[in-house]
Amino acid sequence: MSEKELEERVMISKDQFLEIEKYLQENFHNVKTIFQKNRYLDDKNMTVKKVHNVLRIRSFRSCKMRELTYKVKGQDGDIEYNQMLSHYWFYQITRDSRFPEGCVKEQLLKDGVDLSSIKLLMELYTRRMEVKIDNYLFVLDTNLYNGICDYNIEIESDVSKKHAKEIILKYCEKFGLTYDENYISKSRRAFNSLNKN
C-alpha cells in the first residue's frame, strides 16, 4: 500500500516541548502516547540515503507486528510504501537480507537498491504524543538516537501540504517557534549524527 504524506514539521527546544506538552494535556482529552522504534536500513552502496529516501522497520510497544516502510522523497509530499511484517520476516530482512513480496520490495528494486546487501544502520526511538484536531493530526515527538535527544512538532493534514503549512505556522506564532523550509527529518538527523562519530 502507498500513501502520500501531507505534513510539515518544526524543531523545538526542550522548554518549548514542555510548554506544548502542558498545552496538549490541559486542552485535549484524546491525546494518545505512542512509543515506537525505527530501524533504518540501506544497501552497501547507501543507495537509499543518496537519493534522500528512507527504508525503515517500525515497531510499536503496543503490538507485535512491525511495519516495513520505504519513503520516497516527493515535491508535494513524500510517498510511503508500507506493508506489515511478521516476526519471521523481520528477522529475514535484518539477518539474511531477504524481503517479502510486496510494494516495498517492488519499489526498492525499481530504484536499483541491492536487496542482497541490506544491513541495519541504526535505531531511533520516539515517544509520540498525538491528538486529532479537525482535519489534521497534531504530533509532539521526543526522539532518541546515537546518544542525542531532540524534539519536534508535526502537523499531518488530511487536506494538503499547503494546509499543513498553514496550520503549523499558526502554532509557530502561538508558541514562538521558528519555521524552517529546510527542516531536516529525524532520520536524516540520525544519519548525520553517525557521520560525526
Task: Please annotate each region the language model reported.
Residues 1-197:
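Phosphate-end processing signature that detects enzymes handling 5′-triphosphorylated RNA
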